[in-house]
């Protein structure tokens, strides 16, 4: 899961 990479606001 690369949440920070795809959605830096998260």
Swiss-Prot record:
It comes from the Eukaryota. One of its GO terms (molecular function) is toxin activity. Keywords: Secreted, Toxin. The lineage of its organism: Eukaryota, Metazoa, Ecdysozoa, Arthropoda, Chelicerata. Expressed by the venom gland. This is Toxin To37. It comes from Tityus obscurus. The keyword Secreted applies. It is found in: Secreted. The keyword Secreted applies. One of its GO terms (cellular component) is extracellular region.
